[in-house]
Amino acid sequence: MSVVEEATDDALYPIAVLIDELRNEDVTLRLNSIRKLSTIALALGVERTRNELIQFLTDTIYDEDEVLLVLAEQLGNFTPLVGGPDHVHCLLLPLENLATVEETVVRDKAVESLRKIADKHSSASLEEHFVPMLRRLATGDWFTSRTSACGLFSVVYPRVSPAIKSELKSMFRTLCRDDTPMVRRAAAAKLGEFAKVFEKTAVIEGLHSSLTDLHVDEQDSVRLLTVESAIAFGTLLDKANKKKLIEPILIELFDDKSWRVRYMVAEKLIEIQNVLGEDMDTTHLVNMYTNLLKDPEGEVRCAATQRLQEFALNLPEDKRQNIICNSLLNVAKELVTDGNQLVKSELAGVIMGLAPLIGKEQTVSELLPIYMQLLNDQTPEVRLNIISSLDKVNEVIGAAQLSTSLLPAIVGLAEDGKWRVRLAIVQFMPLLASQLGQEFFDEKLLPLCLNWLTDHVFSIREASTLIMKELTQKFGGQWASTNIVPKMQKLQKDTNYLQRMTCLFCLNTLSEAMTQEQILKEIMPIVKDLVEDDVPNVRFNAAKSLKRIGKNLTPSTLTSEVKPLLEKLGKDSDFDVRYFSEEAKNSLGL
């Protein structure tokens, strides 16, 4: 919503009250008034807003952080309320003050607003008003102002004269050498962004020395931010300069003494690969990556493992299979027994993504042993992640290998103690059914599917009813009549009402995959019986089932078979049963 629209909505709000609330001792009232600042400004008009309201806000800027945060945000949208771009510079002073406060979130919001209004300044106005403010911030006594200054260079630089550009470069380089680590950190964070607005020919001369200094800074919190900056530089430089100036910096960061820097390298690995990959010796890059996979710090191994599949995919196609089998998988085999569960969990999520890259033969000989080991890991998340990549294996190894190698483990996990693992297996049954065929499925897997219908966890029961529809669509209605309906008839008589409800849920999904004749012959007799159930919850679920099943029947069948049952339920003693019966009748037009 625009400032003007918001102000119109609040047009009747007493302006005098809002102005009084700006001075109120109660922080809640001040906060409320600051949020309505645009309403006050609109009522005052642009001239009084510039001369009185902005002056008032500038003078009384010492307040609770939450008030200052809202104020910093509001001022970023104030350009039309002070008379447009010609007068936008009047917003600089209050935002400059906010950019120097102690609270980081307030400073960041003030910088965000300053960046927004910088765009509203003409080039002349930038030089006359914005640059002097930036100069004051960059040379301020307090580190807070110098920190904020770092975020403003990139929005000013492209639109000022060469002389001022030269001054801005010098100012930024000074901030990169600041005595305070927080300022150097802010400069390192914005270095790449600043480089992107430079003339390409000036990047090396203007900023490369700062990158070189910052990547060997004594503070690891500064060095880790140069990873992203170095990547940004790499995208800007030609091949020769990238090789000469950026590659050595990134290589040093790979081996940094601080695990936090190495973690950042692992996080940004694919971007580094994209920047250096074509021009760097592949073996060298792979060696540096495998060192990250073997890093003594678990967090680094975790981040590096996460990127295994994508790193492999980005390798040169002619060398890819050889590198995966001879380098990456050797390290992956060690990670299977890693002491850190998170590392194993990440490995389980990506390892089978290598299958399409190395082909069937290598998948069977190299990946399946890893897969089987992870499938039997003691950590539930590891088992869950490896099961979730079953489809990737399927595509490569085919049904015969699947049935002999993986099936025993899958059957074992069907009764896993962790319900999420069981759920993952349930959800893969339709995929296995299509791969293995009906005969094999009926013999080995159908009993599992039927057992899940009585699982003690609702999510498993629900998921198993949903896959029955997919299985019926694959194998046909007659298959369901032979294999599923007898189980439904058994559940229909179960003493536990939850099982009788599961029976109804399953019939709902089955009906969508069966013909009308099969529904009338196989499903309706069971529903008719459950309409008479002693438990109201079962009866109202029977009404809901009739609503779903009825959508697969012709109007004449609805009238003869479904309507009498719903009318009977409509006279039930239980309110919920009557409600759902009426809802079903309305939905089916009965």
Curated annotation (Swiss-Prot):
<dbReference type="GO" id="GO:0009792">
    <property type="term" value="P:embryo development ending in birth or egg hatching"/>
</dbReference>
<feature type="repeat" description="HEAT 5">
    <location>
        <begin position="189"/>
        <end position="227"/>
    </location>
</feature>
<dbReference type="GO" id="GO:0072686">
    <property type="term" value="C:mitotic spindle"/>
</dbReference>
<comment type="similarity">
    <text>Belongs to the phosphatase 2A regulatory subunit A family.</text>
</comment>
<dbReference type="Pfam" id="PF02985">
    <property type="entry name" value="HEAT"/>
</dbReference>
<dbReference type="GO" id="GO:0005829">
    <property type="term" value="C:cytosol"/>
</dbReference>
<dbReference type="GO" id="GO:0040028">
    <property type="term" value="P:regulation of vulval development"/>
</dbReference>
<dbReference type="GO" id="GO:0051754">
    <property type="term" value="P:meiotic sister chromatid cohesion, centromeric"/>
</dbReference>
<feature type="repeat" description="HEAT 11">
    <location>
        <begin position="427"/>
        <end position="465"/>
    </location>
</feature>
<feature type="repeat" description="HEAT 9">
    <location>
        <begin position="349"/>
        <end position="387"/>
    </location>
</feature>
<dbReference type="GO" id="GO:0005813">
    <property type="term" value="C:centrosome"/>
</dbReference>
<keyword id="KW-0677">Repeat</keyword>
<dbReference type="GO" id="GO:0000159">
    <property type="term" value="C:protein phosphatase type 2A complex"/>
</dbReference>
<dbReference type="GO" id="GO:0043186">
    <property type="term" value="C:P granule"/>
</dbReference>
<comment type="function">
    <text>Acts as a scaffolding protein for phosphatase let-92 and its regulatory subunits. Probably together with let-92 and regulatory subunit sur-6, regulates centriole duplication, microtubule outgrowth and mitotic spindle stability during early embryonic cell division by preventing the degradation of sas-5 and kinase zyg-1. During vulva development, may play a role with phosphatase let-92 and regulatory subunit sur-6 in the induction of vulva cell precursors by positively regulating let-60/Ras-MAP kinase signaling, probably by promoting lin-45 activation.</text>
</comment>
<dbReference type="GO" id="GO:0007052">
    <property type="term" value="P:mitotic spindle organization"/>
</dbReference>
<dbReference type="InterPro" id="IPR021133">
    <property type="entry name" value="HEAT_type_2"/>
</dbReference>
<dbReference type="InterPro" id="IPR054573">
    <property type="entry name" value="PP2A/SF3B1-like_HEAT"/>
</dbReference>
<feature type="repeat" description="HEAT 1">
    <location>
        <begin position="37"/>
        <end position="73"/>
    </location>
</feature>
<dbReference type="InterPro" id="IPR011989">
    <property type="entry name" value="ARM-like"/>
</dbReference>
<feature type="repeat" description="HEAT 10">
    <location>
        <begin position="388"/>
        <end position="426"/>
    </location>
</feature>
<dbReference type="InterPro" id="IPR051023">
    <property type="entry name" value="PP2A_Regulatory_Subunit_A"/>
</dbReference>
<dbReference type="GO" id="GO:0051225">
    <property type="term" value="P:spindle assembly"/>
</dbReference>
<dbReference type="GO" id="GO:0019888">
    <property type="term" value="F:protein phosphatase regulator activity"/>
</dbReference>
<keyword id="KW-0963">Cytoplasm</keyword>
<dbReference type="GO" id="GO:0005634">
    <property type="term" value="C:nucleus"/>
</dbReference>
<feature type="repeat" description="HEAT 6">
    <location>
        <begin position="228"/>
        <end position="266"/>
    </location>
</feature>
<feature type="repeat" description="HEAT 4">
    <location>
        <begin position="151"/>
        <end position="188"/>
    </location>
</feature>
<dbReference type="GO" id="GO:0005635">
    <property type="term" value="C:nuclear envelope"/>
</dbReference>
<feature type="repeat" description="HEAT 13">
    <location>
        <begin position="505"/>
        <end position="543"/>
    </location>
</feature>
<feature type="repeat" description="HEAT 12">
    <location>
        <begin position="466"/>
        <end position="504"/>
    </location>
</feature>
<dbReference type="GO" id="GO:0005737">
    <property type="term" value="C:cytoplasm"/>
</dbReference>
<dbReference type="Pfam" id="PF22646">
    <property type="entry name" value="PPP2R1A-like_HEAT"/>
</dbReference>
<comment type="subunit">
    <text>Part of a complex consisting of a common heterodimeric core enzyme, composed of catalytic subunit let-92 and constant regulatory subunit paa-1, that associates with a variety of regulatory subunits which confer distinct properties to the holoenzyme. Interacts with rsa-1.</text>
</comment>
<feature type="repeat" description="HEAT 7">
    <location>
        <begin position="267"/>
        <end position="305"/>
    </location>
</feature>
<dbReference type="InterPro" id="IPR016024">
    <property type="entry name" value="ARM-type_fold"/>
</dbReference>
<feature type="repeat" description="HEAT 3">
    <location>
        <begin position="113"/>
        <end position="150"/>
    </location>
</feature>
<feature type="repeat" description="HEAT 8">
    <location>
        <begin position="306"/>
        <end position="344"/>
    </location>
</feature>
<dbReference type="GO" id="GO:0017151">
    <property type="term" value="F:DEAD/H-box RNA helicase binding"/>
</dbReference>
<keyword id="KW-0206">Cytoskeleton</keyword>
<dbReference type="GO" id="GO:0046627">
    <property type="term" value="P:negative regulation of insulin receptor signaling pathway"/>
</dbReference>
<feature type="repeat" description="HEAT 2">
    <location>
        <begin position="74"/>
        <end position="111"/>
    </location>
</feature>
